[in-house]
Design a protein with these regions (language model features):
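Non-heme di-metal
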Residues: 1-179
């Protein structure tokens, strides 16, 4: 049976959005509870947020035909989403806020729009690396670090297996010294 265009598809999208928003709210609520000295309540909010994440994942998978798309497709979808946010959504929100006299909110919408543009660029570069087989291979010698144990390797390619902790190449990333 075809899901596309049905009321059930709309319900799945609503359920996914609702569970996603609940997860974020509960995470924020946990932070506030912790700041106010309520560790148990914070932990319960965090536990519930984790449950909501799993509910959202369930509905997302159903919307995707039962399985999440591969990383290349996810990077493309993420880039497209970020593009919409900075070119359309936040630009329109900023315009409306200005027209209605909310200068601070207009500024924030514009500022977040710039961040979303950077997100799009990052996703597009990562997608290019995936397509070109350059996630773990560089044209020049670079510094690679195992994100599990911290092992440093210098070379054009990340090790297939970390020589210290035996984690696979997937745990290596290029080091960006920003200090």
């Amino acid at each position: 049976m075809e899901l596309k265009g049905t009321k059930t598809e709309q319900n799945l999208m609503t359920a996914f959005a609702g569970e996603s928003q609940a997860r974020n709210k509960y995470t924020y609520f946990a932070s506030k509870a912790r700041k106010e000295g309520f560790e148990q309540i914070a932990a319960i909010f965090e536990e519930t947020a984790a449950n909501e994440k799993e509910h959202a994942k369930l509905w997302f998978k159903e919307l995707c035909g039962g399985e999440s798309p591969d990383t290349a497709a996810n990077l493309e979808a993420a880039a497209e989403g970020e593009n919409f946010e900075w070119t359309d959504m936040y630009a329109e929100f900023a315009k409306t806020a200005k027209e209605e006299g909310f200068a601070r909110l207009a500024y924030l919408f514009e500022a977040v729009g710039k961040i979303e543009k950077a997100h799009e660029e990052r996703y597009r570069k990562l997608l290019e690396n995936v397509k070109d087989g350059k996630v773990f291979i560089a044209d020049d010698v670079v510094i690679w670090q195992c994100t599990n144990c911290g092992h440093i390797h210098v070379g054009k390619e990340a090790p297939k297996v970390c020589p210290v902790c035996a984690h696979p190449q997937a745990y290596f990333q290029r080091v960006a010294n920003n200090y």
